[in-house]
């Protein structure tokens, strides 16, 4: 188990506390992503892979909007939390344990959209690991697919010191 897995396994039961209102955030982020997907010509028939799903924040919201969602994560505990939350929200999501640096080990199919939200990519600490991750992600996209990631602007957060920062 690597340090990232250990960190997120330990955070799984507390991760929702990072949000002012986790349930509202799932809906809010899904609506933002839905608007973005529609700008690129996708609708609810798109098949989405959330390759760093954590506790399901984006996957659950997108599934609630009617998208076909597959969700994976490196943390077994976060996946367990995501499965439980998906059931509580009455949504169907296919879950799998996967490292987003090796997605082809878990998935043979390609997706219309792949997302890696909530600052997943900065865990790639070298140019080599980032390159491996991006190649893995692009390898799971259909030819006309899109990849969406979110990365926090920590410089702005340190400068402005807001009392709360939405995770997007």
What are these regions (language model features)?
Residues 49, 57-103:
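Class I SAM-dependent methyltransferase SAM/SAH-binding core
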Residues 131-143:
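A short glycine-rich, Lys/Arg-flanked "PGG" loop and its adjoining helix->strand segment in the class I
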Residues 105-113:
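A short acidic, Gly/Pro-enriched loop at the edge of an enzyme's catalytic core
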Residues 112-128:
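A short SAM/SAH-binding and catalytic strip from SAM-dependent methyltransferases
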Residues 1-52, 146-168:
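Conserved class I S-adenosyl-L-methionine
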């Amino acid at each position: 188990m690597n340090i990232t897995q250990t960190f997120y396994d330990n955070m799984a039961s507390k991760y929702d506390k990072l949000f002012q209102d986790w349930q509202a955030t799932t809906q809010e982020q899904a609506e933002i992503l839905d608007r973005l997907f529609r700008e690129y010509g996708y609708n609810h028939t798109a098949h989405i892979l959330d390759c760093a799903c954590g506790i399901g924040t984006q996957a659950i919201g997108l599934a609630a909007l009617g998208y076909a969602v597959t969700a994976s994560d490196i943390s077994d505990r976060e996946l367990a939390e995501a499965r439980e939350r998906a059931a509580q929200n009455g949504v169907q999501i296919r879950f799998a344990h996967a490292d987003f640096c090796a997605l082809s080990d878990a998935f043979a199919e390609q997706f219309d959209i792949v997302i890696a939200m909530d600052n997943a990519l900065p865990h790639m600490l070298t140019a080599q690991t980032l390159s491996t991750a991006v190649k893995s992600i692009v390898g799971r996209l259909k030819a006309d697919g899109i990849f969406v990631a979110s990365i926090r602007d920590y410089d702005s957060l340190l400068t402005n010191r807001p009392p709360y920062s939405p995770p997007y």
